[in-house]
Amino acid sequence: MPPRSTMIFALAAIVSLAGSSAAQGRGGPQTPLPPGQTNDPFPQPIAGTEGVITVTLREFASLPDINGVAARAMTLVDEPTSRRIFVSDMHGLLYVITPDGDTVSQFLDLRDPKWGVPVQSRGRERGLQSFTLHPQFAQAGAPGFGKFYTYTDVSDQTPAPDFTTPRDTSTHDLVLHEWTTRTPGSTAYDGAAPREMIRWRQPYANHNGGAIAFNSTARPGTADFGLLYVGVGDGGSGGDPLTLAQNLGSAFGKILRIDPLGRNSRSGKYGIPASNPFVSTAEVVPEIFAYGVRNAQRLGWDSRNGAMFMSDIGQNIVEEVSPVTAGANLGWNVWEGSYRFVSQRAVRTDSVRTDPKVTYPIVEWGQIDPLMLPSGQSASVGVVVYRGTAVPQLTGRLLFGDMPSGEMFHVSADDLPKGGQDVIRRVLFLTGAGSTPRTFLDIVKEKTTAQSRAVATRADLRFDMTATGQVFLLNKADGTIRVIER
């Protein structure tokens, strides 16, 4: 494999890098870094052709535009009983889709004033961040019947927040709501206004929450069943200037775990599981499950062994996918991936993965890897462990990706790496008979051109897996939901 410098030069000759911060080390030419520091800790680029898995990508359904703008699809959750698909649009809408993809219905518009949820969706990172269904959503008579949860940036700042930061000023609030529909099988929400559960006062405009999810492997009667995991960003800006991620007295930069049906929290609006790792530790937020998080975009579980994983967006150097266990310190902002964080320009090249108290990534990659150059940006997304058989070439693979470039990657789920990018391999997509393997960004570009939209420059890839093992791909540019097939 040619050295990174050769590959970057070759790609730069065919890819326009105007305006790309990745092209010149994030922000244009800069002074040389001191010895022992680098903005590129990976000597070999991700393999471009070796170990590529090719799958077919089929258009499944389309979401409607909002005022002439494509839906910003963020999260997909299935309801296993009916096999219906729920999908969120970051503008503030939820849709429900029939199992065959033929019928798309608007289930809920959070923006309707009667709900009292003033969705703040300006900018790339704000809006309806995530949602999930309670595992008892379709189980009549169960405590979680009809309940689902939304995680939303809002423009109001009342009532008073449950969690704040030391910063005097703020940009907006982030709110976790519980909704209860009377008829879960309906195509439209028929419940009352939502119940506010938790409110965070956001110090900066970015890193607004992330993923919320229930453990997909937990079964009724097990300790983790019905407990909600909540990814909370480090407050934003850059470099965690308020040092919140390592502060156990703060709820920012964490993965929280709560019982949405309980009431033993300080506010009385939700429960704190007795099994949470810091529940008995003084001066520590008892909701914390893991800490040292920058911007957790997705949470995933392995159905074979229950292992939990997180995709966490890096600063300017390293993207990562990490294992998550109770009480884990995931490193940020002392570490960016396996490397000691220095600044927004650099990490250290010495003392790699040397702190035994830190849980390091299973896999990571450089933001200036040649595969990221078409979008000029990089951000971790995923993560799915595929144990199905319908797409046998993916069986036993852990799937993750890069959000802007649309690259999907795979590694072995049964022989997990210990950091680095050497074993990362690509997943490329066919779109029909006679088609050639392409990246997701290439496919989205083609679609936006056909739709007479502005040609997409980012894929804004998101993907989720249903209980039946179908993997669906989402994006913010063309309103199209796609499913992976053999």
Task: Outline where the language-model segments fall.
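Bacterial N-terminal signal peptides
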Residues: I8-A18
